[in-house]
């Protein structure tokens, strides 16, 4: 059966697949690449059947563009008007259709994984895209469209990207090689060492002289620490953190520590309380003997004055002091 002519496809569905229709539209372009809107326009202008139910077949066509390796996506340059990327045929799918007929497709074009890993394949694809870009530029120049000047590096699709000289501040190289600095601007190694919790041997004399001025009753006028024999310690007596490993003593036979602990001073004797007046015993002496149980004790206290010790120890005197106060 002979193939029907193009003009007989008026309202009938054409015998072309979506892949054939897309390839036909791309091959008809001088630049060999078209945006998606131009592909739609070509199909609807050529085949009236696709002027209806556009949403259904356009979704199917987009699905074929995305999931078939025979189509490649080319990003649009920033200086080009419009939106959306361009679609082109893969350079290796030239023999996909038998004898150049879009009605017969030999087999499904598939890019092997080894082709993705081969170094020559990306270079061939980049060279093809560069040629297509040059063809498009020449076509635009022939039509008189003015394009802004772009650097040559923008069209160098096959070149190898140069490594950037910028290094992230948190990269592992910068973290390892960075010299940590304090907020004041000084390096950490230039800071003064932190004093240890225990005094070093060369600080004992200074501490002793300062303590001697504050505790004269312990150290005397000249200071006990100044008259003591100087302490000689080796480097093994102290650890790396300044903590003494041996007890600090003046000599082998002495038990007095190098920094004496202040001794609590002996409290002075409490002065005796003065003799209390006896107005209450006078009142009690005037009362009857039956009502004053302490009349005998009152007479004794009036005849002989009480000593300070008796005043503190006698219960009767304690009662008198409470009554007076």
Curated annotation (Swiss-Prot):
TM ranges: none
InterPro entries: Fork_head_dom, FOX_domain-containing, FOXB1_B2_FH, TF_fork_head_CS_1, TF_fork_head_CS_2, WH-like_DNA-bd_sf, WH_DNA-bd_sf
Region annotation (Disordered) ranges: 284-325
Inactivation phenotype: Mutants suffer perinatal degeneration of the medial and most of the lateral mammillary nuclei, as well as of the mammillothalamic bundle. Mutants show no deficits in hippocampal-dependent tasks as contextual fear conditioning and social transmission of food preference. They have a highly specific memory deficit, restricted to the performance of spatial working memory tasks with no impairment of spatial reference memory. Female mutants have lactation defects with mammary glands with incomplete lobuloavelor development and morphological defects in the inferior colliculi of the midbrain.
Tissue expression per record: Expressed widespread in the early developing ventricular zone of the neural tube and later restricted to areas of the spinal cord, hindbrain, thalamus and hypothalamus. Expressed in epithelial cells of developing and adult mammary glands.
UniProt cross-references to Pfam families, sorted A to Z: Forkhead (PF00250)
Keywords for this protein: DNA-binding, Nucleus, Transcription, Transcription regulation
Disulfide bonds: none
DNA-binding region of this protein: 12-103
Protein's UniProt name: Forkhead box protein B1
Organism of provenance: Mus musculus (Mouse)
Taxon lineage: Eukaryota, Metazoa, Chordata, Craniata, Vertebrata
